[in-house]
Structure formats: structure tokens, C-alpha cells
Amino acid sequence: QFMVNTSPLAGTEGKFVTSRQLRDRLHKELLTNMALRVHDTANGDIFDVAGRGELHLGILLENMRREGYEMAVGRPRVVKRVIDGVECEPYEMLTVDVEEEHQGGVMESLGLRKGEMLDMVPDGRGRVRIEYKIPARGLIGFQGEFMNLTRGNGLMSHVFDEYAPVKEGGVAERRNGVLISQDDGEAVAYALWKLQDRGRMFVNPGEKLYEGMIIGIHSRD
């Protein structure tokens, strides 16, 4: 969902901030972006936007940001269908190529994301290729985690397979705690430096903050 920014920092990072401006821009995108779908909702400030995945929608968001549009974005969801009276979700065929020392962590993560391992082939030179069938919702946010688990040495590719009945239960959620701003103001270099040992920061010195804003991810769960 794309929506009007209602945070305490609304209106500070863009010149196009109203629902009408967002709607006009999204409908203009439909003229050239054939894989995009935009639907109005009961709330005039919120729009349902569907595309071909995180990368597709991420490119649209970045283009709009550079053009001066400011908005809030909801958590991505997969598009489900009802087939013969059964609720179904999209599944993908996933192939990962990793070093053997990272194999365990990757397999654990994909297991928590409802992945079903179909094949595993070592290459005899310290790497292994593993194939999975996994719900598309299990791949949301996995790219960054995969890069961390493999220290940037892993390869992954996935392609749509089919719509099949929804697997029960949710996929793995974020397992780490977060760092939260306790007051309004600007981020200070000294304060961020003192907090670095506690986790990875999302903000830089000089950025405006508000009370309750998530500013980093904690190193512990």
C-alpha cells in the first residue's frame, strides 16, 4: 500500500505530498508500466499497488522519491487467489549456490520461511547448490538476510512456479530487537557512536528524529 505520509516528519522531504498528487502519479505510471496495478481503497489516502515483486515496486518508489514525492509505504504482501474454493498463494522455485560453511544458516532460514528442499548438489570444490519450493511470501526480505548469511558470496535466483494452497502458519518474522528514539530532535554523531556496539543504525548524524522512531536494529534478539 502507498499512502499519504502522516508521521511527525510529514512534509519535510518532498514537495508532492497530497493524496491527489500521489494518485495522479500512480495512474500516470500505468500508461507505461504494464505490470503495475493500482486500485483505490475505501480510504482516499491509501492506494493498493501491485507489481512483480520487491524490485519492481522498489524501483517505482525510488523514482517517485527522486521526483519529489513523499509517501508512506505499507508492508508488502503477496496476491492470493481462490481456486476451486481453496485459498491459494504463489510459490516460487528457488535455487541458492553457497559455500558449504554457510549452508547450515541458509537452510535454517529457509526452513523458517516455509521452504521445502527438493535437491542438494555439492560441487566438490567447497560449494553446494540447493533447490527449494517456497511460498513467495517467504522470500519477502530474504535477499538482505541471504547476503548477510553468506557474507556476500552466495548466489540466488527464483522463478514463479504455481499457485497452491496456503501453508498454515506465518513465515519467520524479524528475530532481532530494535533501537528506538526516546525524544524528538536531530541525530548526534557522538550519541550514534556510543550506540554502535548495540546494533546497526538506520540513521546518520544530522537526520531529524521523533519519539518512538525506529533508528536501528539490535544485535540481540
Label for each model-derived stretch:
Residues 1-221:
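Accessory interaction regions appended to the cores of large information-processing enzymes
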